[in-house]
């Protein structure tokens, strides 16, 4: 029997068997692993053991999320085929089974329709994995805003009202610590013309008519169709598909419906609120930020200890594995296959993930 060797690295490990006909390598990447335990559920020889996920997620201990017994593992590749986050991969003679038509593959995907995208950056702000970057290039400011602003310092009494009301934070006051020889708390006023949008708010609020604003091209002063404002704004939304967990936060929040997400499973997450002890392990481990402690509107309102937004859940099961009181159940009703299993043994193995 050919010996299987396990090499451990800082962010994972590789188990490999080097035979005369073929070389098999099973690689695990800790950075991509979310601790869902799907690999352990599907393993036909029970070679995979999950770590203390709740404690790991909450930062109580530092340990691997899983381990594989190299002497038990048969390098069949079921775990790699079922892993929805590509944390496991089996290579046969250097080729990944994810690229091999003979092996099943779970599908998850995300698409950005750049022609719809308005480059608002909201998707980037909400992504729990930091997998989205909006590359936005603005035209030179002078193409949008042209004008002049003048402050008559003989009329100005340095009251600061203009600075308080300026929506662009373009007016700066120079403050002074009052002394008997120099008692004025404000000694000067300046306009940052790189920030000023010539909206005339300062002119309107000045009680001494000390400010004059001349606007040649000012979007804030009149209604301009959105397309006009965007004429000179270019860019694109970039998704790091290795980091993306297809939670759907981006599509959920997108005001332009420019993002489409395909999740690996359909079903629902069921929480036994009576069993839940509100430890927070599920919240800490969830790669999708789909769980939260609800906040009551007032002291009298009763709320569940924990709630889930089903729209943001990928049904990976990491929360269920981390829960110390077994208060969470994953009910999967459908697997989104890119390639369905053909062999009977593989079909039966994938059935373990259902229900």
Curated annotation (Swiss-Prot):
Residues 24-53, 64-93, 108-137, 147-176, 187-216, 235-264, 267-296, 304-333 form the 4Fe-4S ferredoxin-type domain. [4Fe-4S] cluster binds at residues 33, 36, 39, 43, 73, 76, 79, 83, 117, 120, 123, 127, 156, 159, 162, 166, 196, 199, 202, 206, 244, 247, 250, 254, 276, 279, 282, 286, 313, 316, 319, 323. Binds 8 [4Fe-4S] clusters. The keyword NADP does not apply. InterPro entries: 4Fe4S_Fe-S-bd, 4Fe4S_Fe_S_CS, MvhB-like, Polyferredoxin, Polyferredoxin-like_ET. GO terms for molecular function: 4 iron, 4 sulfur cluster binding; metal ion binding; oxidoreductase activity. Disulfide bonds: none annotated. It comes from the Archaea. Keywords: 4Fe-4S, Iron, Iron-sulfur, Metal-binding, Repeat. Its cofactor is [4Fe-4S] cluster. CDD domains: MtMvhB_like. This is Polyferredoxin protein FwdF. It comes from Methanocaldococcus jannaschii (strain ATCC 43067 / DSM 2661 / JAL-1 / JCM 10045 / NBRC 100440) (Methanococcus jannaschii). The gene is fwdF.
């Amino acid at each position: 029997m050919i010996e299987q060797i396990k090499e451990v690295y800082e962010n994972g490990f590789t188990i490999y068997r080097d035979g005369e006909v073929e070389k098999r390598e099973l690689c695990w990447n800790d950075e991509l692993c979310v601790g869902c335990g799907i690999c352990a559920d599907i393993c036909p020889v029970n070679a995979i053991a999950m770590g203390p996920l709740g404690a790991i997620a909450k930062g109580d201990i530092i340990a691997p999320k899983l381990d594989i017994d190299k002497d038990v593992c048969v390098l069949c590749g079921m775990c790699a085929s079922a892993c929805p986050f590509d944390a496991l991969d089996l290579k046969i003679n250097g080729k990944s089974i994810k690229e091999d038509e003979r092996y099943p593959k779970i599908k998850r995907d995300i698409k950005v329709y750049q022609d719809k995208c308005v480059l608002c950056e909201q998707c980037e702000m909400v992504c729990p994995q930091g997998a989205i970057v909006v590359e936005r290039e603005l035209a030179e400011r002078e193409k949008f805003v042209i004008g002049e602003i003048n402050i008559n310092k003989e009329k100005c009494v340095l009251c600061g009202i203009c600075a308080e009301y300026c929506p662009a934070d373009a007016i700066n006051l120079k403050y002074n610590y009052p002394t008997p020889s120099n008692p004025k708390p404000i000694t000067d006023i300046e306009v940052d013309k790189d920030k000023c949008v010539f909206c005339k708010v300062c002119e309107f609020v000045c009680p001494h008519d000390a400010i004059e604003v001349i606007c040649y091209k000012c979007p804030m002063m009149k209604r301009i169709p959105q397309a006009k404002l965007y004429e000179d704004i270019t860019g694109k939304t970039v998704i790091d598909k290795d980091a993306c967990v297809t939670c759907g936060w981006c599509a959920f929040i997108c005001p332009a419906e420019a993002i489409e997400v395909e999740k690996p499973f359909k079903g629902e997450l069921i929480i036994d609120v009576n069993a839940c002890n509100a430890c927070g392990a599920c919240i800490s481990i969830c790669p999708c930020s789909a769980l939260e402690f609800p906040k009551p509107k007032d002291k009298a309102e009763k709320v569940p200890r924990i709630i889930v937004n089903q729209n943001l859940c990928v049904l990976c099961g990491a929360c269920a594995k981390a829960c110390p009181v077994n208060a969470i159940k994953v009910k999967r009703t459908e697997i989104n296959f890119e390639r369905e299993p053909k062999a009977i043994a593989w079909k039966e193995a994938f059935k373990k993930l259902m229900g």
